[in-house]
Regions:
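Catalytic machinery of carbohydrate-active enzymes
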Residues: 1-279
């Protein structure tokens, strides 16, 4: 089950056989149709990993031998399924992925041993072409996040600085909205050292883009978690959110945390130094 926004990415994941699409802002009739679609299949297990009212209703209405959800479910969802995955020993302070891995115990498995996610995705010709020229090292930059206070404000300054200081580095911007460079980008675009793909990629292209990079730089965001899930090295910039709960899984050593939770206090020089050490 996936929101329409993420469905193309979920479909591309090699571990997924079928995707049901949930329209978050859809009508009540659309929700009823989704329930009918789900009920056409008899499942062995249905797991509610989100733990909210609507996901709980979908779990309740499904035809499954076993139905399970989160013990910390909200909005009354915990009453919709007979089986529950307990919180890990750290409780609600555990990492979000640690909480979800507790579902493995329902299948007599230990909550560890995750394998990297793999995808069947390709890039469009227009996006693939500027990424074909070796032998430059490639830094993939995702400047956006879901909330403004989680966005580091110095990506423009950092990009300009790295282009000046690192002639053997290609920098690629990726984002949902078009971002115009404020630095003098023309010569770097002509030499293919700066590639601006912001506003021109589909979500299903993200795995191919991330896979082509030597290093990823991102805020606390979906692309950061995707890079970590693919086991691609990612430098993650954290402000108000707690990296112990939401940091890149398996790469907590690559987290740069802003003083006082204020990303404006994380300097360009600090981030640039960390990147160059890893490149």
């Amino acid at each position: 089950m996936s929101r329409e926004l993420f469905a193309p990415l979920v479909r591309a994941c090699r571990t997924v056989d079928h995707t049901y699409v949930f329209h978050r802002k859809g009508s009540v009739w659309g929700f009823v149709k989704l329930i009918r679609e789900i009920r056409q299949t008899q499942f062995d297990w249905v797991l509610d990993l989100q733990g909210l009212f609507r996901s709980g209703v979908l779990c309740l209405c499904s035809r499954a031998k076993n139905k399970a959800g989160r013990s910390d479910a909200r909005e009354g969802a915990r009453w919709f399924y007979p089986l529950k995955a307990n919180l890990p020993q750290k409780g609600s302070e555990a990492h979000a992925l640690e909480i979800l891995m507790e579902f493995k115990r329902l299948f007599d498995k230990q909550p560890d041993g995750l394998k990297p996610l793999t995808f069947d995705t390709t890039l469009s010709e227009s996006n693939r072409k500027p990424l074909c020229d070796p032998p430059l090292k490639r830094l993939m930059i995702f400047p956006e996040s879901r909330r403004t206070e989680k966005e580091w404000p110095f990506f423009q300054e950092l990009t300009g600085m790295l282009l000046q200081q690192s002639p053997n580095l290609q920098l690629v911007w990726v984002g949902t909205s078009p971002i115009q460079p404020t630095f003098h980008a023309a010569p770097h675009v002509q030499s293919n050292r700066f590639v601006n793909l912001s506003g021109s990629t589909g979500i299903e292209e993200l795995p191919a883009l991330i896979g082509s990079a030597d290093l990823v730089l991102a805020n606390d965001s979906g692309p950061m978690h995707l890079a970590a899930a693919m086991e691609k090295e990612v430098v993650a910039l954290f402000g108000p959110t707690n990296p112990n709960q939401y940091g890149p899984w398996g790469q907590f050593h690559n987290v740069l945390t802003a003083p006082d939770g204020d990303l404006a206090k994380l300097t360009t020089e600090q981030v640039g130094k960390t990147l160059m050490q890893k490149l």
